[in-house]
UniProtKB/Swiss-Prot annotation:
Composition bias, Polar residues: 71-81
EC number: 3.1.21.-
One of the record's GO molecular function terms: endonuclease activity
Chain positions covered by the region annotation Disordered: 69-95
SUPFAM superfamilies with a match to the protein in the record: His-Me finger endonucleases
Location(s) in or outside the cell: Secreted
Protein name: Extracellular endonuclease
UniProt gene name: endX
Family that this chain belongs to: Belongs to the EndA/NucM nuclease family.
Length: 229
């Protein structure tokens, strides 16, 4: 799994006309905190958190350095937008800018695509442990954390419990936004999708996020927008 596929790559870059959908990273971050509060589990290692503090001892996470930062959590997008190659929909406003239909995040101005990506609640991969989040471009072990990072090879192997979600997210982005997947990548994600089927929490998350964004991930399952309060 190459460095650009670190953990979950702007979970479903969904920008819709839904009235409640946030349009900036700040708005998305506020909504995401509320959405993920009941789960209270960060993305990379599955550590529990309370507010912006992570219970490192309970999940066996051992920071490589900067223990103070490791104990903090932050809402963040889980990929580098400039490397994702996601095609933006025509005429979708991105702050004060607009990304044309033929523009991809690999060719558009970094600031433009970053703003577009970060405006989506789906790009918030719960809450991430700060140190591991800061070391996504680097490699090593973090105690009992099952997500492994190989700094030299620039590869990441996410923990088993999130592999299926990662696969279904890529399938969604490939169909909805034209993300190009190599044959090898698609085979890997198909294997993950089969080995790690949709879990109840993933269906619930899909429904909850759909109520905010106005659209669900069909690879996770159907959503009922009429049930949204």
């Amino acid at each position: 799994m190459s460095a650009r596929f670190i953990a979950v790559f702007c979970l479903f870059f969904t920008v819709t006309a839904h009235a409640q959908a946030p349009r900036t990273f700040s708005e998305a971050k506020k909504v995401a905190w509320k959405l993920y509060a009941p789960q209270s589990t960060e993305f990379y290692c599955g550590c529990k958190y309370n507010g912006n503090r992570v219970d490192l001892k309970a999940c066996g996470y051992v920071p490589r350095k900067n223990a103070n930062r490791a104990d903090a959590s932050n809402g963040n997008t889980s990929s580098r937008p400039g490397r994702s190659g996601i095609s933006a929909s025509a005429g979708k406003p991105v702050g004060a800018k607009t990304v044309r239909a033929t523009t991809t995040c690999s060719s558009a101005p970094r600031r433009t695509c970053t703003t577009w990506c970060r405006a989506s609640v789906r790009s918030m991969a719960t809450v991430t442990t700060s140190v591991l989040d800061g070391c996504r471009c680097n490699v090593g072990k973090y105690g009992s954390c099952l997500t492994q990072v190989d700094f030299k090879a620039k590869k990441v192997m996410p923990r088993p419990s999130i592999r299926g979600m990662i696969a279904r997210t890529y399938f969604y982005m490939s169909k909805q936004y034209g993300l190009r997947l190599s044959k090898q990548d698609r085979q890997l994600y198909e294997a993950w999708n089969k080995t790690y089927p949709v879990q109840p929490w993933e269906r619930q998350r899909n429904q909850t996020v759909a109520c905010v964004m106005g659209r669900g991930n069909e690879f996770v399952g159907p959503v009922n927008l009429k049930a949204c309060g």
